[in-house]
UniProtKB/Swiss-Prot annotation:
It is a multi-pass membrane protein. Its EC number is 2.7.8.13. The keyword Magnesium applies. Catalyzes the initial step of the lipid cycle reactions in the biosynthesis of the cell wall peptidoglycan: transfers peptidoglycan precursor phospho-MurNAc-pentapeptide from UDP-MurNAc-pentapeptide onto the lipid carrier undecaprenyl phosphate, yielding undecaprenyl-pyrophosphoryl-MurNAc-pentapeptide, known as lipid I. It comes from Anoxybacillus flavithermus (strain DSM 21510 / WK1). GO terms for cellular component: plasma membrane. This is Phospho-N-acetylmuramoyl-pentapeptide-transferase. The gene is mraY. It comes from the Bacteria. Pathway: Cell wall biogenesis; peptidoglycan biosynthesis. Its main location: membrane.
Length: 324
């Protein structure tokens, strides 16, 4: 398999998303699947109220079609392909239910935290079942070192922690026009390079299919956004990148490649702990991207800055894995 296949895969996913979007967005608008904006959020966001959401369905459809076609044409589908699609679509479905409850049933909070956690745990456990069935490695290595540890049965705890925590971290990043789409494209691109370097072409194909799909979505999601991906897209992307990290045995490296997601999550944790213990907030608002908006940065400036930071993290991750 050569580089042309990778480029063709990304291009196909991009085109499918770009073609679907002008059809899908008006359909979402007619169904009145509009995003509700939190009153406590930045005032500049109130004008976004009613913007169609659940656009993550386009990403899911595009990456699924592309992965299925490309794996059918260029190599026999592997267990990795099925596991990646299962977790991604599973978390996407969970996000869709959450979006549907919020948008259609007009319950602002969507699924309760317990319901969402139960869904995330169920998908994680089913994934672990397949992981065990195919006797995959439970060894975890520290990037850039020769240090490794076989977790054995305890690896299931790592899978649960990564899938639940990772999907929520990616979800938190989806707060500004184009922010998650851009940072996700960069992170998945980094893992595509590393999967290709390992000879895991099935994982590389899936990764670049995601890159193409989210870049196609970014055409319509960049400021001012014509559509939001919703939890349908953000939870799916979170589940997908964690699964890729597990299958490539680069679990810990996700902390670096997904550095933006980690920072966003830490900002929320710090804010909550600080307010509960001292009654004071460290940031104007969390996640961190809203803090920068409230100190005067334009939305576009925040997004581009976070993209740049995400790119630096991705380059650092590739460097550590390939050259250190």
């Amino acid at each position: 398999m050569n580089e042309k296949v990778i480029l063709f895969t990304a291009g196909l996913a991009f085109i499918i998303t770009v073609v679907l979007s002008p059809i899908f967005i008006p359909f979402l608008r007619r169904l009145k699947f509009g995003q509700s904006i939190r009153e406590e959020g930045p005032k500049s966001h109130q004008k976004k109220s009613g913007t169609p959401t659940m656009g993550g369905l386009m990403i899911l459809l595009s990456l699924s079609i592309t992965t299925w076609l490309m794996s059918d044409i260029f190599f026999e589908r592997t267990a990795h392909t099925y596991m990646l699609l299962f977790v991604t679509v599973g978390y996407g479905l969970l996000g869709f239910i959450d979006d549907f409850i919020k948008v259609v049933m007009k319950r602002n909070l969507g699924l309760t935290s317990k319901q969402k956690l139960a869904g995330q745990l169920l998908i994680a456990l089913i994934f672990y079942f397949f992981f065990q069935h195919y006797s995959m490695s439970t060894v975890v290595s520290i990037p850039g070192t020769d240090v490794s540890l076989d977790l054995g049965v305890a690896y299931v705890l790592l899978i649960i922690f990564m899938l639940v925590g990772g999907s929520n971290a990616v979800n938190l990043t989806d707060g500004l026009d184009g922010l998650l789409a851009g940072t996700a494209a960069i992170a998945f691109g980094a893992y595509a390079v590393l999967a290709w370097n390992q000879g895991q072409y099935d994982v590389a194909i899936f990764s670049v299919a995601v890159v193409g799909a989210v870049l196609g979505f970014l055409v319509f999601n960049a400021h001012p956004a014509k559509v939001f991906m919703g939890d349908t897209g953000s939870l799916a992307l979170g589940g997908a990148i964690v699964t890729i990290a597990i299958l490539t045995k680069l679990e810990i490296l996700l902390v670096i490649i997904g550095g933006v997601f980690v920072i966003e999550t830490l900002s929320v944790i710090i804010q909550v702990i600080s307010f509960k213990t001292t009654g004071k907030r460290v940031f104007r608002m969390s996640p961190l991207h809203h803090h920068y908006e409230l100190i005067g940065w334009s939305e576009w400036r925040v997004v581009v800055t976070f993209w740049a930071v995400g790119l630096l993290f991705a380059i650092l991750g590739i460097y550590i894995e390939v050259w250190v």
